[in-house]
Amino acid sequence: MAVEARHMNLFSSQYITNRECVKSQTNMNNGQQIAGGGFPVTIGDRNLQYIDPINSFNKSESELTAISKRQRDSTFDSDALIASQKRRAIAFSPASLIDAELVSQIQQQNSEIDRFVAQQTETLRIELEARQRTQTRMLASAVQNAILKKLKAKDEEIIRMGKLNWVLQERVKNLYVENQIWRDLAQTNEATANNLRSNLEQVLAQVDDLDAFRRPLVEEADDAESSCGSCDGGDVTAVVNGGCKRCGELTASVLVLPCRHLCLCTVCGSSALLRTCPVCDMVMTASVHVNMSS
């Protein structure tokens, strides 16, 4: 808001004119006093006769000067009275009223300026507070967004770790089940191995019994062969080294259990279709290969 400041003349032209008149009157009075004062004069012996007339003249002149001075003083007093009356008249003149109106307008303008400055200051304060609140909200929003991003990343990491933990738990369960299966299989194999071991021990015991049973037969056959001669040797050989009771082609080398008949060859003894002994028709539980080479 632009305010045009008017320079007010606190002293009117009438004040200046009266002051100049008083000043000129004073100068004139001073000039008359200086003119009436005279100059110093040097008087000799020859001129002593003129002193008395001069003194008398001076006395008369001083009386005239005093009279004129009193007149001037009275004139000055009258002029001062007239000037004071004029000043009083000027104080209540329309010009003084105009000056008072100007002063009131200036005061009003100053009050308006102060009010405008106060209003602008309040507006600026409100704007600064609003801007500060906006910046505070923006900062809080930025901090909140950063915190939310970090929390979201942590939540995603927690979910990922939970999935990984679930996968590991499933893997542990599978490993546990697999371990249990392998343990059961190991126990089954161990039981099978123990059963096979016991069966093998039984077979070995039966083989020992078979060897003990064959030894007297072989000795008797040898004795019979030595006593009967070469004509009866074929029959003894057929008894001792008889062929397979099933195919009749190969030499019997498989002992059938539990009847203990040595009546099958290697091929027939390995067949899964043979379930009974071909000699006594007893159910065959096992078979043992016998090495007939001497």
Curated annotation (Swiss-Prot):
InterPro entries: Znf_RING, Znf_RING/FYVE/PHD. E3 ubiquitin-protein ligase involved in regulation of abiotic stress responses. Not involved in ubiquitination of MYB108/BOS1. Has no effect on the stability of the DELLA proteins. Induction: Up-regulated by salt and salicylic acid. Down-regulated by gibberellic acid and methyl jasmonate. Not regulated by pathogen or 1-aminocyclopropane-1-carboxylic acid (ACC). A zinc finger (RING-type) spans 244-281. Disruption phenotype: No visible phenotype. Decreased resistance to B.cinerea and increased cell death upon pathogen infection. Boi, brg1, brg2 and brg3 quadruple mutant shows a higher GA signaling resulting in a higher seed germination in the presence of paclobutrazol, precocious juvenile-to-adult phase transition and early flowering. Gene3D superfamilies: Zinc/RING finger domain, C3HC4 (zinc finger). GO terms for molecular function: ubiquitin-protein transferase activity; zinc ion binding. PANTHER family: BOI-RELATED E3 UBIQUITIN-PROTEIN LIGASE 1, SBP (S-RIBONUCLEASE BINDING PROTEIN) FAMILY PROTEIN. The RING-type zinc finger domain mediates binding to an E2 ubiquitin-conjugating enzyme. Residues 183-212 form a coiled coil. One of its GO terms (biological process) is proteasome-mediated ubiquitin-dependent protein catabolic process. Pathway: Protein degradation; proteasomal ubiquitin-dependent pathway. It catalyses: S-ubiquitinyl-[E2 ubiquitin-conjugating enzyme]-L-cysteine + [acceptor protein]-L-lysine = [E2 ubiquitin-conjugating enzyme]-L-cysteine + N(6)-ubiquitinyl-[acceptor protein]-L-lysine. This is BOI-related E3 ubiquitin-protein ligase 1. PROSITE patterns: ZF_RING_2 (PS50089). It is an enzyme of class 2 (transferase). Its EC number is 2.3.2.27. It comes from Arabidopsis thaliana (Mouse-ear cress). The keyword Cell cycle does not apply. Pfam families: zf-C3HC4_3. It comes from the Eukaryota. Interacts with the DELLA proteins GAI, RGA, RGL1, RGL2 and RGL3. Keywords: Coiled coil, Metal-binding, Plant defense, Transferase, Ubl conjugation pathway, Zinc, Zinc-finger. Residues 168-204 are annotated as: WRD domain.
